[in-house]
Amino acid sequence: MTFNIIKLENWDRKEYFEHYFNQQTTYSITKEIDITLFKDMIKKKGYEIYPSLIYAIMEVVNKNKVFRTGINSENKLGYWDKLNPLYTVFNKQTEKFTNIWTESDNNFTSFYNNYKNDLFEYKDKEEMFPKKPIPENTIPISMIPWIDFSSFNLNIGNNSSFLLPIITIGKFYSENNKIYIPVALQLHHAVCDGYHASLFINEFQDIIKKVDDWI
């Protein structure tokens, strides 16, 4: 992984970053996403929905530098060339979850196979983070498949330097002959404004609609 340093004094977002970082301003937005065609196509091809959604999320994240901007372990501001998903997997027996990361790949089939291999290896481990070491360039993704929701918010402790997005997916539901899932996006205002939240949602919806192009 490559971490590219941002020189704050020369950054065109310096004023906004300092203001919102000092305030520790984060926000969340939840939007229902139409997955009617997507769900049908995934089912026909014999794939699982969760890793397919993770792939679509990572395509948006890795396409846009703003979603890869963060602070590394050396307390340096910058952006990674690529992020990998760190996603939750629920264990029905223990009623707890594990967090597993998988290498991102632009090719869906390659990513899906890597996901399945990691899932087989680590899903039954009774640890919160069974696959170690966890690289710095990961982004949290989770799914709450038991309920659909109209809003969802996560709060990280004060003085946190975590700037990357956090994505949470809910249960899909039917309405007016269409199928939707709620997607909650948690962002840090120091690096992402409302425009960027809209960018994520719109591009995610677009890649979901164009599932024929990549599956």
From Swiss-Prot:
Assigned keywords, A-Z: Acyltransferase, Antibiotic resistance, Plasmid, Transferase
Reactions mediated catalytically: chloramphenicol + acetyl-CoA = chloramphenicol 3-acetate + CoA
GO molecular function: chloramphenicol O-acetyltransferase activity
Gene that specifies this protein: cat
Residue positions of the active site: 189 (proton acceptor)
Protein name: Chloramphenicol acetyltransferase
Annotated InterPro entries: CAT-like_dom_sf, Chloramphenicol_AcTrfase_AS, Cmp_AcTrfase
Quaternary structure annotation from Swiss-Prot or TrEMBL: Homotrimer.
Positions of transmembrane segments: none
Role of this protein: This enzyme is an effector of chloramphenicol resistance in bacteria.
